[in-house]
Amino acid sequence: MTQYIFITGGVVSSLGKGISAASLGAILEARGLRITMIKLDPYINVDPGTMSPFQHGEVFVTHDGAETDLDLGHYERFVNMRATQFHNCTAGRVYLEVIQRERKGDYLGKTVQVIPHITDTIQQYILRAAQGADIAMVEIGGTVGDIESLPFMEAIRQLGTKLGRRDTMFIHLTLVPFISAAGELKTKPTQHSVKELRSIGIQPDMLICRADREIPEDEKAKISLFTNVPAKAVISGLSVKNIYEIPMLYQKQGVDDLVVKHFGLHVKEANLGDWEKVVDAINHPEHEVTVAMVGKYVNLTDAYKSLNEALYHAGIKNKTKVNIRYVDSEDLYSQGTELLAGVDAIVVPGGFGNRGVNGKLRAVQYAREENIPYLGICLGLQIAVVEFARNVLGIKNACSTEWDEKTDEPIIALVAQWVNERGEVEQRDKKMDLGGTLRLGALPAKLKAGSKIATIYGSEIMNERHRHRYEVNANYEKRLEAAGMRISGRSADNDLVEVIEIPSHRWFIGLQSHPEFTSTPLGGHPLFSAFIAAALDYQTERLS
């Protein structure tokens, strides 16, 4: 039978509930438990797919093609789980489902209300996603007291009552700020946050108190007194240099022991040796490289969260500190390639629309002509193909129909049709809704024998996640290959271009997929490890 941990947050947003939950999940998994993690988001969007990265950060794509919250990326990086569409439940999705049922007459003429119809649907999502796990950890987005989150809070309160206290646990994250003028930590915000939580019927079993310094025992006792949480369950959530230290931080304070005792479990002790090796590799690198990331969302680096982490994971594998130099593509176009001076590799990540495209084209040209390692992801592949067509093939008007619908040289064009992972034919055109109309999820690709990408993967098949609408136009493929660009990967039906390389270049690869979504700190990812290794080789040659 699955047992449930519900994680809520109070005082302020952005306390790191996702990281905290994932870190606890990693410890519990190390104790031999099967863990799954679920995110409940109170916004009305059906999914974050059409939200601006400046509003929401990265859209994390699951194996089955759901566009989800970036916290699911944390879950998959910390815990050995494969998230699905049911592991991220938004208010918009819940309301849409309930309204659709009402229109079909499923409620048999009843008045449809928040309680029980909305709250029951939320609970159904939780129970469905939790199947097969020993412990399901459920993070509720937002802050206690937000009007948007009330249906979700009520849903988990009801579920806790139905399942019983022995099978449910509530963990609340709060902030304990240090007031420099007074020279002390203040516990009052935490007291009031728990009071708000208790007013809706939820008594927390554990508090994780975010602070920039250790919380003294007398302050923990004070928090315990006013919140009805045992002092030993008041945990210091200290800020750390890197997030992969957090499992050890929590284990030292006995967080996992509190969970195991609460649920009455008899399991082995956690061995976090692998996590300790990760932290040691981060803290004691033997080398250092600088990678330029050229994009248009660089002022909010969470827009590239999984890519950032994948590069850091590759650094771990290469015993290398990876410094990411974020370069705004519009600045690059206006100020020139001096912004790329001294970098050891260049990556152009995914994106949509035509803003900043010219700067990305300039970055690709610089990498190609200066023989600097280049990795293009999704849009980064398309940019590389257009740049090659313009400056090598001499097709000066080469463009994407995403940037110019009337272009007479559509090197990149709309994906009109493909077969999805379920074997169903998907069709798209420009008149369709934006939301949920991309080529999404993990899709297999065949790699050309002897290609660099096949060597890196150690296989002639790869299966990475996608999120795009546009593809390389098949009418230009022969000309591209004749000029020196190799199409080294195609979708399993040999239809769509998945990977391109320039064999004459030291390391130049573009992928239509998003391999960053499957990189983990413990396992890394072969593509990014090879990319950072190439950056090291280039640096050695550049400095010699």
From Swiss-Prot:
GO molecular function, one term: ATP binding
Mechanisms controlling activity: Allosterically activated by GTP, when glutamine is the substrate; GTP has no effect on the reaction when ammonia is the substrate. The allosteric effector GTP functions by stabilizing the protein conformation that binds the tetrahedral intermediate(s) formed during glutamine hydrolysis. Inhibited by the product CTP, via allosteric rather than competitive inhibition.
Swiss-Prot/TrEMBL GO biological process terms: 'de novo' CTP biosynthetic process; pyrimidine nucleobase biosynthetic process
UniProt pathway annotation: Pyrimidine metabolism; CTP biosynthesis via de novo pathway; CTP from UDP: step 2/2
Catalytic activity line of the entry: UTP + L-glutamine + ATP + H2O = CTP + L-glutamate + ADP + phosphate + 2 H(+); L-glutamine + H2O = L-glutamate + NH4(+); UTP + NH4(+) + ATP = CTP + ADP + phosphate + 2 H(+)
UniProt: CTP binding residues: S13, D146, I147, E148, K186, T187, K188, P189, T190, Q191, K222
Binding site for L-glutamine: G351, L379, G380, L381, Q382, E402, R469
CDD domains: CTPS_N, GATase1_CTP_Synthase
Note: CTPSs have evolved a hybrid strategy for distinguishing between UTP and CTP. The overlapping regions of the product feedback inhibitory and substrate sites recognize a common feature in both compounds, the triphosphate moiety. To differentiate isosteric substrate and product pyrimidine rings, an additional pocket far from the expected kinase/ligase catalytic site, specifically recognizes the cytosine and ribose portions of the product inhibitor.
Protein name: CTP synthase
Organism: Dichelobacter nodosus (strain VCS1703A)
